[in-house]
Regions:
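Soluble or luminal CAZymes and related metallo-dependent hydrolases
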Residues: 7-11, 79, 114-128
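N-terminal, active-site-proximal structural segment of metallo-dependent hydrolase catalytic domains
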Residues: 1-44, 53-55
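Metal-dependent phosphoesterases centered on the DNase I-like endonuclease/exonuclease/phosphatase
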Residues: 120-159
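Glycine-rich phosphate-binding loop signature in dinucleotide/nucleotide-binding domains
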Residues: 22, 95-98, 131-136
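Active-site-proximal beta-strand elements of phosphoester/diester hydrolases
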Residues: 1-9, 98-112, 141
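Short catalytic/ligand-binding loop motif for oxyanion handling, primarily in non-cytosolic enzymes
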Residues: 12-14, 35-38, 111-113, 147-151
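Surface-exposed cleft-lining segments at the edges of enzyme active sites
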Residues: 73-74, 104-123, 148-154
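Structured beta-strand-rich core segments of catalytic domains in phosphoester-bond hydrolases
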Residues: 32-110
C-alpha cells in the first residue's frame, strides 16, 4: 500500500502528474486547488476517487486515490475545524465491501479565531475526533505546520 502526503504549496494543476506517476493508494495533498481546476495530460491516469475541502477554490485539502480505494466523509465531520477532515477509506469497488481504514487528513493553517490557528486546529481535531480515530486502524497525516519555535504565547492547545 502506498500512502503519501504533500503540501504542494498551491498550483496543484501544474504538479499533479508528479504524484500520478506513483499511482498512490491514498494521497493527501495540502494547499491543493479544487480538483475542478485539474486537467490531466494525455497519457496521465487521473485519480479514481477523491474528496476535497477548502474555503475557496485555490487552496484546500485534497484526498485522492489512483487505485481501488474510495472515500466517504465521516458523519462526525465538523466544518468549523478547518482542514482537519475525518475520512473513511474503503478498498474494493462495492460500497461497504473490502477493508476500511480511517484517515484524519490535516492541513493546519491560520484561522480567524486565534486559538484555532495552526496547532490549535490539530488539538481541537484530536479532541473532537477521539472516537473516530479509535474506531478502526487510523492514519493521522498531513501538514501540521507545527514547531515549538513558533510559539510566542503559552496556551492550553500549544506545545
Amino acid at each position: 500500500m502506498l500512502i503519501l502526503t504533500w503540501n504542494c504549496q498551491g498550483a496543484f494543476r501544474r504538479k499533479a502528474q508528479q504524484i500520478a506517476q506513483f499511482m498512490p493508494d491514498i494521497a493527501v495533498i495540502q494547499e491543493c486547488e479544487s480538483p475542478a481546476k485539474l486537467r490531466w495530460a494525455k497519457g496521465v491516469t487521473p485519480p479514481s476517487d477523491f474528496v476535497w475541502f477548502g474555503e475557496n477554490s485555490s487552496k484546500g485539502v485534497g484526498i485522492f486515490s489512483w487505485t481501488k480505494w474510495t472515500f466517504t466523509i465521516d458523519p462526525s465531520h465538523d466544518p468549523s475545524i478547518h482542514h482537519c477532515i475525518p475520512v473513511i477509506a474503503t478498498s474494493g469497488a462495492d460500497e461497504g465491501a473490502g477493508d476500511k481504514v480511517n484517515l484524519l487528513a490535516i492541513w493546519a493553517s491560520g484561522h480567524k479565531q486565534k486559538e484555532l490557528s495552526y496547532v490549535g486546529q490539530v488539538y481541537r481535531a484530536v479532541e473532537q475526533y477521539h472516537d473516530f480515530v479509535r474506531q478502526r486502524p487510523t492514519f493521522v497525516l498531513g501538514d501540521w505546520n507545527s514547531n515549538a519555535i513558533w510559539d510566542r504565547e503559552r496556551k492550553v492547545n500549544n506545545h
